[in-house]
Amino acid sequence: MESSSPHHSHIVEVNVGKSDEERIIVASKVCGEAPCGFSDSKNASGDAHERSASMRKLCIAVVLCLVFMSVEVVGGIKANSLAILTDAAHLLSDVAAFAISLFSLWAAGWEATPRQTYGFFRIEILGALVSIQLIWLLTGILVYEAIIRIVTETSEVNGFLMFLVAAFGLVVNIIMAVLLGHDHGHSHGHGHGHGHDHHNHSHGVTVTTHHHHHDHEHGHSHGHGEDKHHAHGDVTEQLLDKSKTQVAAKEKRKRNINLQGAYLHVLGDSIQSVGVMIGGAIIWYNPEWKIVDLICTLAFSVIVLGTTINMIRNILEVLMESTPREIDATKLEKGLLEMEEVVAVHELHIWAITVGKVLLACHVNIRPEADADMVLNKVIDYIRREYNISHVTIQIER
């Protein structure tokens, strides 16, 4: 028996007897000292700096939202305006969305553990589910109160205070739009390519190959983010170099997705604040038109619920382990079958641990004369380049 142990890999070769009837070669790679999960704690200092900047901006956005939400709750009660309270409920949904984005960035630095081998990203989904239930409860209470007021017609609304609070909200939203929009508008300007392979974060390869006298061979590959390729020839190097720029660009867009989502939330809030201002101005002008406040309440309640639909859909799809909507599994399989060395693809599974953290596993049958290592890297390169799935497990079969 011969063994070789590089820093992050372990290779064992076993020869049975004096013949080559059976040979087992196992190569494995783990992230750090723990089972590999989705921890990005090994990322370069540039990535850590960018993540820190994004977290700082989202923290400021959360604080501003909480301050303004408190002002709206107090102002809504004093003005007796359900529209303002509904806007406060909408702000709560934004706070939840910002907090989830913030947690996502924070958890990116957590280490996976032997028990939590995928890390702690699923907490993000559970937190989002709880926050949505709270938002639906508050919105339901406000809609019920609006209907009661429409029926009884006993409430009085302070239009001036309603207008003032909404105007303050518009100012806060503009500040947040400038804060978040700066990064949104410049997210494309800081990409650098490096020619050193150890900078390419495409996770490793685990290959298990069995050679029997029945000429039956299996290969397993496991990839997820930090690839130090000790290449199997020039073809592998060319494949990885070819897609490096494209993958880097996609990763850059992915890192900015949280701030872009927050930016869109703020734009929606600004429109709603303008609506409340108009309603407040109408009631300020003519207090008898207080029904405008109730109309705004019902309309904004629909908006609040509408903003959570996409959220709840994503949550259910993750919990059901559905194939993410942005990935066409049929097209992906077809792309693999178009490779001349590939005969068949089966047991194809694509799912997500949380939104944006996608995994893929499948079995790939190849031609008897094909080079298993070359096909392995070719398949992984295709999946990373075309679908930006960095956590990949492939089993090669003949």
Curated annotation (Swiss-Prot):
Q: Which residues lie on this side of the membrane: Cytoplasmic?
A: 1-56, 111-122, 181-263, 312-398
- The biased composition feature labelled Basic residues covers 187-202
Q: Could you list this entry's UniProt keywords, alphabetically sorted.
A: Ion transport, Membrane, Metal-binding, Transmembrane, Transmembrane helix, Transport, Vacuole, Zinc, Zinc transport
Q: Tell me any Pfam family this protein matches.
A: Cation_efflux
What is the membrane topology listed in the Swiss-Prot or TrEMBL record?
Multi-pass membrane protein
Which compartment or compartments is the protein found in? Vacuole membrane
Please name the InterPro entries in this protein's record. Answer: Cation_efflux (IPR002524), Cation_efflux_CTD_sf (IPR036837), Cation_efflux_TMD_sf (IPR027469), CDF/SLC30A (IPR050681)
- Segments in the Vacuolar topological domain: 78-89, 144-159, 285-290
Primary residence: membrane
Per its UniProt record, what PANTHER family does this chain match? CATION EFFLUX PROTEIN/ ZINC TRANSPORTER (PTHR11562), METAL TOLERANCE PROTEIN 1 (PTHR11562:SF88)
NCBIfam families given for it? CDF
Its protein name is Metal tolerance protein 1
Classification from the root reads: Eukaryota, Viridiplantae, Streptophyta, Embryophyta, Tracheophyta
